[in-house]
């Protein structure tokens, strides 16, 4: 009875946030419910088939793909809009369904996983992101490892071409290891298990302690991040009985095309070295706008810019804007790449003639500001 009353109150707060304050209200119900009923996560998760998705990059798009596959089995709810902290998970669980697919922030995975006891956890990747909050990658990997040890009945699905994902899966009792032929990891010089230097042979690694990406249960061809996440989504969904579905890779890219007075702009989300590298590889236009902010959700520390090669932008017309535009412009200058700093995105986009096609790589806050405007 107390839980039901708490849910009613939480929903009223959500209604007030949406209708009166004109806000999204996606996390307010969950935030209120956790205050009123701290054990809401575990209670709402009872007798439900739950799948969790976590990783530095690709969580939202992969969650959408898993949800699409799972929905063929029965009623399904998801937080695929990106509200991935514990309060977002609770808000989603407040909706009735047989299946629940949750995107979960890397640091919040411990609480959500241990309280919901999911059928499946898909671990996509792990790399430096929001250093002021995440600190070192190894810290998050150790947390994931403890989760794997604590949930013997949960099946862990992971891309072990990432040594940090491999570390977590090594401790899982039930797991499906996946390899896409290997790829270099910028943070993978040292073995996250024993601290010795990893031995890399082309794109594959192994350590004397036994950590390796070779001998995965499922060995697939290499491809883009969207391609990899599409396969991981189908593998995770198959654990609970879903049949593989065709997934258009473009659907998994965090990109939107918008028109600005005749200028077609392809907006792509970039928030850390891995996502920047992926986005840069997808730049097809000769006109590019780069937007860098450094707010809390973007990551206050921008030192990671020096981990990225911008060579693919050489000889293109590059405009740089955002709160930390000078940091980015200087980084490009050091690599010998010319750019122009412009005060705002609105002024930058107007510098291109009508019918132009422009690639826009934008920080988290800038991306969603443009998408929602």
Locate the predicted segments by residue.
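Phosphate-binding loop of NTP-binding sites
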Residues: 4-176
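Short, polar loop motifs at secondary-structure junctions
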Residues: 106-108, 160-165, 323-326, 344-347, ...
